[in-house]
Amino acid sequence: PDRERPELCSAAIDRVRREWARALKREPRRRGVAQARAVLGLATPFSESALESAVRWLVLVLGLPVPRVQYPIDTSEGRWWVDMCWPGKRIALEADGRKKYQRAEDLWKEKRRQDGIESQGWTVLRVSYGDMMRPDRLGAKILTRFPPGEVAHLQRRQELEWAGMRLEAGLREASLLGQRLPRGSAGFVP
């Protein structure tokens, strides 16, 4: 999908959602259908990496409002897109894989980008694959960016969690994404 013109693919996205909803309706008692419906209702085709999807899953499990994804922020350095954010709070989350920083100038460009975004009054939190290995700790870190009064009233979306799994157990046990990791892995390398 085109993040600059998301309306161009909205009909296709709606069609796919309806197809999946019909498929789930045919199997109402099958294990995992309720969770699949919850995921389908919150899914987006605009996440650009597995890490972005995993972080988005975590913020949704925590009960935070649905973040905007691939959101443009205009700065004196130009227009930059953040992976996900809450515009009303001016909080942005960036999911960073190692491939993003192959050359020294990549790191410098990213620093200028973040400086520009922060100069517009935004708080930027960077998340790596290693952070997602302990979603409980990462979740606590993310929540510190939000007003404590709001955090106190969040309702966890338990329907997005795998039955019997806990965030405290780490990504391997907390989500289906983690189930695909090789045993003993310290993290992903995108």
Please place each PLM-identified region on the residue numbering.
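Metal-dependent nuclease catalytic cores that hydrolyze phosphodiester bonds in DNA/RNA
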Residues: 1
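Surface segments flanking catalytic/ligand-binding clefts of nucleic-acid enzymes
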Residues: 4, 8-190
